[in-house]
A protein has these predicted regions:
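Short solvent-exposed loop/turn micro-motifs enriched in small/polar/acidic residues
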Residues: 32-34, 95-96, 114, 211
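N-terminal signal peptide c-region/cleavage motif recognized by signal peptidases
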Residues: 24-26
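Structured domain cores in non-transmembrane regions
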Residues: 61-141
Length: 222
C-alpha cells in the first residue's frame, strides 16, 4: 500500500487513517501534494469570459490517485473512455475553505469566477495525472492588466504556475513572476511563532499559501 497524508480539500483519496504515524508533523510535512498549473484565458470583446485550468499532479500523488481510482490497470498509460467517464471531475468537489485556488484580478478589481466544470482527464509522460477544468469569468474590462495566482491558503497543496499560459481571442504576453521562497519561509516561521510554534500548528496550520504563490501577468495589446 502506498501511504500519503490526504485531505478532502480536493475531494481526493482518504488514506490518512491508515497511514497515521508514518509521516512527519504537519508543519514539517507541508506541502503534501505538488501540482504544476497552466491557464487558458478566453477573451471576447476585450474581456475575459472564461478560463481553463490545467493541473498536472506529481508522480507520487498520481500513483496514489491511479491506485485509489483503479485507473490504468493494464499499465499502458492510456485511460479508457469508461475510466475517464467514471473519474472525470474527481478533484472538483472542493471543501474546507478551498475554492479551487485560482485568484484573478484586473488592476485592483478581483474577477468573479464561476463554478468549475470538468473538461478532461488523462495520463501524460510516465503516468502523471493531468486534469483540466473550466470556469466562467466575470470581468469588468478596462485597461488594467490581468493577473492570476493559484494557491492553497493552507499550503497543503503546492501549486507552481509553470504550465502553458495561453490566451484565446487576444494578443497577450504572459509573464511568470516566481514567489520569493526565502521570504515565504520567513513569513511561515513568523506565522507559526505567532500561534505557538510547530506543535500548535499541527492542528491549526497558518494560512500562508499566498506567500508561496507564483503570479502570472498578462500584458495584452490594444
Amino acid at each position: 500500500m502506498v501511504c500519503s497524508p490526504i485531505t478532502s480539500r480536493l475531494a481526493l483519496p482518504t488514506l490518512v487513517a491508515l497511514c497515521a504515524g508514518l509521516w512527519p508533523s504537519a508543519p514539517s510535512a507541508h506541502p503534501h501534494i505538488f501540482v504544476d498549473s497552466g491557464l487558458r484565458l478566453v477573451v471576447e470583446g476585450g474581456v475575459v469570459t472564461a478560463v481553463e485550468v490545467t493541473w498536472l499532479y506529481d508522480e507520487l500523488y498520481s500513483l496514489i490517485l491511479m491506485e485509489d481510482y483503479g485507473l490504468d490497470p493494464d499499465f499502458d498509460l492510456v485511460l479508457t473512455e469508461e475510466e475517464v467517464a467514471q473519474t472525470l471531475g474527481f478533484d472538483l468537489n472542493w471543501s474546507h475553505g478551498f475554492e479551487g485556488g485560482l485568484v484573478m484580478h484586473r488592476g485592483e478589481a478581483e474577477l468573479t469566477l464561476g463554478a468549475p466544470s470538468p473538461v478532461s482527464l488523462e495520463l501524460v509522460g510516465e503516468g502523471q495525472v493531468r486534469t483540466v477544468h473550466r470556469r466562467a469569468v466575470t470581468d469588468p474590462g478596462g485597461s488594467g492588466t490581468v493577473e492570476a495566482q493559484i494557491y492553497d491558503p493552507e499550503f497543503y497543496v503546492a501549486f507552481e504556475m509553470i504550465g502553458e499560459m495561453i490566451v484565446e481571442g487576444a494578443t497577450c504576453t504572459p509573464e511568470l513572476i516566481r514567489a520569493d521562497i526565502d521570504a515565504a519561509y520567513a513569513g511561515l516561521e513568523a506565522a507559526m511563532d505567532a500561534i505557538g510554534g510547530a506543535v500548535a500548528a499541527e492542528d491549526n496550520f497558518p494560512a500562508v499559501g499566498d506567500l508561496f504563490a507564483d503570479r502570472v501577468v498578462f500584458e495584452c495589446a490594444g
